[in-house]
Amino acid sequence: MESRIKVLVVDDSAFMRKVITSMLESDPRLEVVGTARNGEDALKKRKTLAPDVMTLDVEMPVMDGIETLKRLMSENPLPIIIVSSTTKEGAENALTAMELGAVDFITKPSGPISLDLEKVRDLLIEKVASAPNVKLKPTSKKAPVVFRPLQQPVPFDKTIIVIGTSTGGPKALKQVLTKLPKDLPAPILIVQHMPAGFTESLANRLNSLCEIHVKEAEDGEIIRPGVAYIAPGGYHLETKRLGTSIALHLTKEEPRKGHRPSVDVLFESVSALSSIYKVAVIMTGMGSDGTEGLEQLKRGSCYAIAESEQSCVVFGMPKVAIERKLVDEVTHLELIADSIVRQCKR
């Protein structure tokens, strides 16, 4: 019998420690070896209990989750799942934590008697059970990739870029989008698996770092070149023709493969736009979201890029697309922006 995955639960709320422990122990693959009420307590228990995975609250007394995460990742990294509140501050903290090396996050259940609890439980179990397989990488010491800016923009009506990603996506998106020039002659539509309330913070953070404009997508807006639109958490992102323009459409249709927004839904919608060249990018993430949509995109004029196993945090979504032979190029995360730019110049 396989040994169980050992988990340390860190939260300043006794009630939340109990709820999370109960959720995790409902799965036979997981064993909660201990709990801690703050960061200092967590650092001590990490040494004595040797957990495989840690769930970590952010807002705690004595030592908060961000400081705890910094210490853990600099001394002896382990996979950490952030347990975040759904407030704007909680969203910002979760994004900061992922930049510092946390592998993923979930939002706290909203109450003890709630349908929300069951959803959170299934998500928490999935993320914790897969966390030991996630690659933990130190910050790259390699020389930055030299970026060659576009010399001659091409009209927008020729190209549209679509990106799908999940676990590890916020850091991957930062790597790609910060290397794109402000005069990029194509719009970018992005699905990042995230709950409602978090995608706006992600868009704002990326916008402050990028030459292109990055924003959360809004229903009915006309897409423009040089702008990246991130699907809001809880909504599918689709496109529709409006005369010679293309507008965004947000829907609350059922989740696909458990996801809303879904990469498949975006890719399938964009595949229906005739006479437009599509550049599709699938990056780090669990599961196979995006593969069905990519099959439809490839029936038309589409160049598909998959992130290589070498740079993926989780080599799931790209792996499936590669195995189905739907991909034209497999490349390291640091080179994806360069590939996108080359396709815009074709």
Swiss-Prot record:
Matches recorded under InterPro entries: CheB-like, CheB_C, CheY-like_superfamily, Sig_transdc_resp-reg_Me-estase, Sig_transdc_resp-reg_receiver
Q: Which GO terms describe its cellular component?
A: cytoplasm
Out of the domains of life, which is the source? Bacteria
Name a Pfam family for this protein: Response_reg
PTM note says: Phosphorylated by CheA. Phosphorylation of the N-terminal regulatory domain activates the methylesterase activity.
Catalysed reaction(s) here are: [protein]-L-glutamate 5-O-methyl ester + H2O = L-glutamyl-[protein] + methanol + H(+); L-glutaminyl-[protein] + H2O = L-glutamyl-[protein] + NH4(+)
Which keywords accompany this UniProt record? Chemotaxis, Cytoplasm, Hydrolase, Phosphoprotein
Location in the cell: Cytoplasm
- What HAMAP family would the database entry show? CheB_chemtxs
Function statement: Involved in chemotaxis. Part of a chemotaxis signal transduction system that modulates chemotaxis in response to various stimuli. Catalyzes the demethylation of specific methylglutamate residues introduced into the chemoreceptors (methyl-accepting chemotaxis proteins or MCP) by CheR. Also mediates the irreversible deamidation of specific glutamine residues to glutamic acid.
Similarity comment: family membership: Belongs to the CheB family.
Domain commentary: Contains a C-terminal catalytic domain, and an N-terminal region which modulates catalytic activity.
Q: What is this protein called?
A: Protein-glutamate methylesterase/protein-glutamine glutaminase
The organism is: Halalkalibacterium halodurans (strain ATCC BAA-125 / DSM 18197 / FERM 7344 / JCM 9153 / C-125) (Bacillus halodurans)
